[in-house]
């Protein structure tokens, strides 16, 4: 079974947002660049189903403020379910709403972009917490992408991945949360009470990938999977980048693609094709090499700021050419975090704005992150319920971190979210490990 969506031009921007005085004074100088930062998107989807547990979310015309075109953005998600489709469907239907709820509605565009990484962490945890009240056995990977102008923010758990090609170079915007890919994640789970190892067979031999027992899940992070253990956390890896005015192409695919194709092969086999045909070609290339052993899904998004040229540039630069021009620039502490300064960076590089993959919730919600006033004093930072003055529990309640963190510093959690945080950190072990001779979840 295959599914497709038409590749149609979609505007991904709106009217001008409020800008600082410094930008207004230089508007004449940068008018061309400002126009180029309202990109056009072309989107393609192709999927071949084996179990019917892959779900996608394509919404190119979102508005964070309903009825305000200047607040427009686009959102795309891929949810690769396992042990049933419940977690994938629930996450698809609720994640974006939870992200928007976690960000104050009155933020300007600059602060909205700065708040997104932390809001996505809160939304992933809330979605997981809410779903686990409804089901125990289902789980899902999540790769969720928000595009606002030339800014791309990606949050991911599991092994579905998002890769960017821009300016002739390839950038990985998500993490692989399989145990085989990270000793750090193996150590975290075992220290929290999980048993990580390979499947035992008759004679004592161990086969297959590293898995967490009980349950046999090969992922250290997902949404759902309550039956495996709370140390399988929904805290996402988040990366935010800003494209140059040349635009780029995103490939978002499930492991059915990445288990067979490298990012280079995926881009090479589809470079001359529009998004719909590119997504189909990538899936068919993967299936042809390995057969249809799993649901195999691909989303391709072309970001085209130059409306005079609706075709992606297809000439890949030769290695060694333009090394500094094509470097993946990461902001340093000396760089201003203001949107004003970001507007005037070298336009020929992909700039890394934010990256964090820590699995510990207290660190991901830390008050040192941008937008210090994002979390209100009497609102739970995760589920957004109102708290009485005596009810809030600081995320630093049990912190042993050095510095000026104090137990009465925010952000604050309600009792239920505090218990969720403790469980994810291994402070509330709900079950003992069981034998590795059982079946596996994924």
UniProtKB/Swiss-Prot annotation:
Domain of life: Eukaryota
Family statement drawn from the similarity comment of this UniProt entry: Belongs to the PP2C family.
The protein's enzyme class: hydrolase
Gene3D superfamilies associated with the record: PPM-type phosphatase domain
EC nos: 3.1.3.16
Protein keywords: Hydrolase, Magnesium, Manganese, Metal-binding, Protein phosphatase
GO MF annotation, one: protein serine/threonine phosphatase activity
Disordered: annotated span: 420-442
Domain PPM-type phosphatase, residue spans: 35-303
Alphabetized PROSITE patterns for the sequence: PPM_2 (PS51746)
GO biological process: regulation of intracellular signal transduction
Stored InterPro entries: PP2C, PPM-type-like_dom_sf, PPM-type_phosphatase-like_dom
Biased composition (Basic and acidic residues): 420-434
Reactions that this protein is recorded to catalyse: O-phospho-L-seryl-[protein] + H2O = L-seryl-[protein] + phosphate; O-phospho-L-threonyl-[protein] + H2O = L-threonyl-[protein] + phosphate
Binding positions for Mn(2+) 2 per the UniProt entry: 80, 255, 294
Pfam families per the UniProt record, alphabetical: PP2C (PF00481)
Cofactor binding mode and count: Binds 2 magnesium or manganese ions per subunit.
Residues engaged in binding Mn(2+) 1: 80-81
Name recorded for this polypeptide: Probable protein phosphatase 2C 15
